């Protein structure tokens, strides 16, 4: 965890290109603005490569797949690879349908991603572990999140973050557990998707993907806890959460929230 990342985001205002789903676009954009990043939500296939070339990170989120989504994401992803731009993939609901699984497989075949961020059910699907996923929700399975993160990172050669009751991040060599968060984050749509965007912002200023991801998740969880203390319910939680993100540079996040283990 490198807390200075939050100050660097605010100083540099990195441009984060999001090809994301229609449910969360507004929340993700506001969350990025809250931490000092600059969001752009360009998803027309005619312009995504050009937009990616001028961006500092690319976030691909398959939440609401359309007929052109796959081609658009691959074109943007290849442009990012050419430009040396880090990529975050959020495989929302990948276990729900064969269509989603096939799309993610083809994206991964053509694009080198820096970080995959998903819930346990989504990551389990990617590595072929049986899991009772429910739509875009995590569902239940027998494999530990720690093992899911480690095996997925080894398979795809990138950092993998598994979020849920237990948050795990792995680069295929070490696994880092990030403690914290609140159940309220599951009662508001888009909190996971915004986390992926925040990981992208951290990657824009910190090229070590493991360090950037752990920092993003730790700060994000801490803001969730602060917002939960101030909110009366799911209606005003997003407001307090965005405020906490905006004030993140002022907080001292306890260092004992991270536990490291080797593979």
Curated annotation (Swiss-Prot):
Superkingdom of origin organism: Bacteria
Chain sites annotated for binding ATP: 117, 163
Pathway terms, separated by semicolons: Cofactor biosynthesis; thiamine diphosphate biosynthesis; 4-methyl-5-(2-phosphoethyl)-thiazole from 5-(2-hydroxyethyl)-4-methylthiazole: step 1/1
GO BP field: thiamine biosynthetic process; thiamine diphosphate biosynthetic process
Coiled-coil segments: none
Gene Ontology cellular-component terms listed: cytosol
Keywords: ATP-binding, Kinase, Magnesium, Metal-binding, Nucleotide-binding, Thiamine biosynthesis, Transferase
Catalytic activity, reaction form: 5-(2-hydroxyethyl)-4-methylthiazole + ATP = 4-methyl-5-(2-phosphooxyethyl)-thiazole + ADP + H(+)
A molecular-function term among this protein's GO annotations: ATP binding
Co-factor(s): Mg(2+)
InterPro entries tied to this protein: Hyethyz_kinase, Ribokinase-like
EC number per UniProt: 2.7.1.50
Sequence positions that bind substrate: 41, 190
A Pfam family matched in the record: HK
Enzyme class: transferase
SUPFAM superfamilies in UniProt: Ribokinase-like
PANTHER family: HYDROXYMETHYLPYRIMIDINE_PHOSPHOMETHYLPYRIMIDINE KINASE THI20-RELATED, PHOSPHOMETHYLPYRIMIDINE KINASE
Functional description taken from the UniProt entry: Catalyzes the phosphorylation of the hydroxyl group of 4-methyl-5-beta-hydroxyethylthiazole (THZ).
Family designation: Belongs to the Thz kinase family.
Designated name of the protein: Hydroxyethylthiazole kinase
Originating species: Exiguobacterium sp. (strain ATCC BAA-1283 / AT1b)
């Amino acid at each position: 965890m490198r807390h200075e990342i939050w100050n660097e985001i605010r100083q540099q205002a990195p441009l984060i290109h999001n090809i994301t789903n229609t449910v969360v676009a507004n929340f993700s954009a506001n969350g990025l603005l809250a931490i000092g990043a600059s969001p752009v939500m360009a998803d027309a296939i005619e312009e995504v490569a050009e937009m990616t070339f001028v961006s500092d990170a690319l976030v691909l989120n398959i939440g609401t797949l359309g007929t052109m989504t796959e081609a658009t994401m691959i074109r943007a992803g290849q442009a990012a690879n050419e430009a040396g731009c880090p990529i975050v993939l959020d495989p929302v609901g990948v276990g729900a349908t064969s269509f989603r699984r096939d799309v993610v497989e083809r994206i991964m075949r053509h694009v080198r991603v820096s970080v995959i961020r998903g819930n346990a059910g989504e990551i389990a699907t990617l590595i072929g572990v049986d899991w009772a996923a429910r739509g875009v929700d995590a569902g239940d399975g027998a494999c530990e999140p720690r093992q899911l993160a480690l095996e997925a990172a080894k398979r795809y050669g990138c950092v993998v973050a598994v979020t849920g009751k237990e948050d795990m991040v792995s680069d295929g060599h070490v696994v880092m557990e990030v403690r914290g968060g609140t159940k309220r984050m599951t009662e508001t749509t888009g909190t996971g998707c915004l986390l992926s965007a925040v990981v992208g912002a951290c990657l824009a200023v910190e090229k070590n993907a493991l360090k950037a991801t752990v920092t993003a998740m730790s700060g994000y969880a801490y803001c969730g806890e602060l917002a939960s203390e101030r909110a009366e319910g799911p209606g005003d939680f997003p407001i307090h959460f965005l405020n906490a993100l905006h004030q993140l540079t002022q907080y001292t996040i306890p260092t004992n929230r991270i536990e490291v283990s080797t593979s």
